[in-house]
């Protein structure tokens, strides 16, 4: 019996030793691939330059999703498109042009939010400043037809609120301005009688205060001042309204113009100079509803197939640019990590899921759908590695004390990739479990108590990257990527995801949240 036990123990030792040796060989192979055959920038190139900006409901989003499926299949992963929801109409953005004709002639630098109207071909017209009172509207109503109208405020990327709630707010402000005018008449009479110089009350402003009336009068479009770099989001009211159909879409363009050009044009209008603006904006809609899907690829676990490690990013991106950073920095390294793992012959003990979420920019829609559909899996997720930030490389992690030893062991090979790139595991204190969604897909999982420990990143080479410059702006381009950072990120992601998947036990959640 003793001899049999010794033989069994020896076999177990050999088996475990062989498995450990095999995994070490896989990690070395991943590092080699990362150095000699790293294709992360190819993935980002296709995603951002061949497909471009890709909001849900667009052809670009659907085409990018199909491309991801094709790539994953070619690498040997299991992959599927999983329906996550639908949107009432679709939207495809074409090119846009504009110019000032006359004195101070110049090309115009502008954007329009997604899901807003384009022009009816090339349209040219004079320019007016929007009215603030009934009297001002009456004075100019005969000139509104065929005019471009400058509206108040500074753009935050959204169009004028054309909803019933927006109409209600505008009606309220109009009434308040009527009362202000009455009080100003009293102030005028008082000043005239007494010789005092009591200041008049300021009228309240609201972008597009006479929006409905101006649309009915036949304006060509609205123009609002916007800080540079220009930011353009989407028509949230249209997308979220269940009553939206192809037949009730707003038909007047909503233009966000470079603040410096806006100031010049506004001054020219105030000085009553003669000039025109010309725009050609090719924004196109699709009949809906349009379904959108999460792209889910997987490497099935060899020992714990019903336990999971998630690597994720979001596939959708605003189309004012091409989503080179937001979220090319998530999708590119995720795809390349999957390719590296397959090419290196990885056979993880746990299933690794590679998830490209839909609709993050419209409110984490794909992540919410995944959590709802797969609620039974939430307790079996070791960690979610979600990347949705800049191109900076991983330089460490903050983890609960109960995970510290595991992550120190898992990440030990990371320092072999590039000695000039630091990587350190540090202990973090328990935090309150979030109760509301934040700005990323990871927040949806965190609310459910799932570990969403991400990498600490840093611009260690000092390449002067500024996330705010690209965040939902015209500069979110492929060229804003830093190739060496992205290549390192893909390699680190592959190694760490595999390491977590190969632990003998699921990562402890002790000390993760204060319950």
Label every model-predicted segment.
Residues 8-16:
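Bacterial N-terminal signal peptides
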Residues 20-63, 70, 78, 299-303, ...:
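N-terminal hydrophobic or amphipathic helices/low-complexity stretches enriched
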Residues 24-26, 107-109, 113-139, 240-324, ...:
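Soluble metallo-hydrolase cores and metallopeptidase-like ectodomains found primarily
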Residues 27-35, 49-59, 96, 125-131, ...:
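Second-shell loop/turn segments in exported
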Residues 45, 49, 53-186:
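Noncatalytic luminal/extracellular "stalk/propeptide" segments of secretory-pathway proteins
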Residues 103-107, 145-146, 156-157, 252-254, ...:
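Metal-dependent peptidase/peptidase-like ectodomains
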Residues 206, 433-489:
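Zn-dependent metallopeptidase/amidohydrolase metal-coordination segment
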Residues 246-249, 253-256, 264, 339, ...:
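His/Asp/Glu-rich mid-to-C-terminal helical/loop segments that flank catalytic regions of hydrolases
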